[in-house]
Each structure stands twice: as structure tokens, then as C-alpha cells.
Amino acid sequence: MKKWIKVIIAVVIFVIFARALIVLSGMENGDVITKPSIAVMDISGQIFDSSSAIETLKKLKNNPLVEGVIVRVDSPGGAVTPSMEIYDYILNLGKPVYAAMGSVAASGGYLISLGADSIYAEPSTITGSIGVIMNLVNTQELMDKIGVKSVVLKSGAYKDAGSPARQMTEQDKKVLNDVLMDMYYQFTDIVIQRRGLAKEKVMQLADGRVYTGRMAQQNGLINHLGSWRKAADDMKDKLNKPNLEVYEVPAPKTMLEKLTETSSKTELGKIISTKTGFFYLAEIY
């Protein structure tokens, strides 16, 4: 093998190895902050897992140089439990946290924003959509036409409630709707508590409709109109530290992306979004 080929191979191996050390050391999610700063992190896309957001929040919480956090939210929401987990972590971060809404911060995206001390949105931001949704598909007639029969063994009458293989009974609907409404009231209770609004007003607002940022402010659902930069400036004023650095935390990447610095968009989000379940999700068409 020619000498120059060996050199190229050696360099490639070294780069990959060095990159792996950086990844494994966790120096890409806010650990490289070297001076007192306001950290700006992003939560975007549909929410089906809380681990990435919470990992970043945890690092910012434990970094003594981070004096405050701006959470930029650009999400229509997603699964109920991950949305709740992120909300809880933001609420209990122990540092000043402001939420800054992007194009969309609705349903679960609005919920996680409620954990912040103050909420900012652009006048044109789409937010609100306070509610829960569950989409179910019934394929019984199709299965009958093609001669496919479903055999189900179950321990109770409602174990297969919502199954696509049989028609849903009224009692099935009631059982599932009871669960859905309990999740809904958990959401509205948080809105009442965090926004200081009367229950009657929240229940009027929480019918699933979306609002612009301007409408949301008029209804008391957010605090301020403005971008994340305004939020950062206001936090500096609140802390009385006008010279604080503003550090934008890099968005988390997959292990392969971290090692190779390549990224690719997949259809995974679309595949996941077809899952059956209860969602704090704004279905904006």
C-alpha cells in the first residue's frame, strides 16, 4: 500500500477517534460554557421522548456558569407523558427560565412553556390548542371483505377497547373518554395554576382551538410579545447583569451524526405520529 494512502487512513482514524472522545465526554450539550452565561436551548418537533431535552436541561442546571435558561419552543406537542416530564423539569430547574415560542408552540408545546417563569411569543405564533386527542382507526369492514378474522383472548371486557379489529361500543368510548378527560383536566389545572386565571375562563379557552401569540397574550395565556432575543435581554435586566454572554446550546444529535457530522432527515417522525395513544397535540392542517 502506498505511503500516502496509509497516511490518509491514519488521519481518518484519528479524526473519528478524537470525535468519539468529544462525544463521550459530553462536551456538546452545554458543558463548554466557560463564562457566566444565559443558555439558549431548543425543543422542537413533535414530542415523543423527553430524554434528550431533559439531558440538556440537567447539564444546564448543574453548570454553575449558567445563570439562566431560555427555552425556545417550536413544537405542536406530542405524547402526554413526555410533555409532562419536560414541563416538570423546567418548572423545577432552580434557575430563571423563560420560554420563547417560535412558529408553533401548541398543546404539549404550550404545556412545556408553562413550566417557565415567563412566556414570550411572536404576534403570529400559533399556540393554545389546550386539550387531548386520540385517533383510532377501525378496519373491521375491510377485514371482513378480505376474509381476515381477528381472534382475541382477553382478561377483561375493555382490554381491547379501541382495537381496529372490532367496532367500538358506547361503553368502550366512555372508558377511553374518561381517561382522556382526566388527562385534559391535568392540563387545565396546570394552566389555572401557572397562569393565575379563573377556572371558568380557562375552561372557555381550553376547547382545543389555537390562538395567535397576540390573542394568547390578550387572554392571559402568555406574558410578552417578542423574540427569544427580547427574552434574553429581559433576563439580563432581571438579573441586573447586562454583560452576560448568551450561549446557544447545539441541538442534540444522534451518535452517528456526532461522529461523522452528517445529518439526514428521515420519515421517522411521520411513522411515529401514526401511533395510537393519548396526545397533547395540535393537529394543524
Where are these regions (language model features)?
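Short gly/pro/ser/thr-enriched loop/turn and capping motifs at secondary-structure boundaries
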Residues: 104-108, 126-130
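N-terminal organellar transit peptides
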Residues: 1-99, 104-105, 118-121, 134-285
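Hydrophobic/aromatic residues within transmembrane alpha-helices
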Residues: 112-113, 216
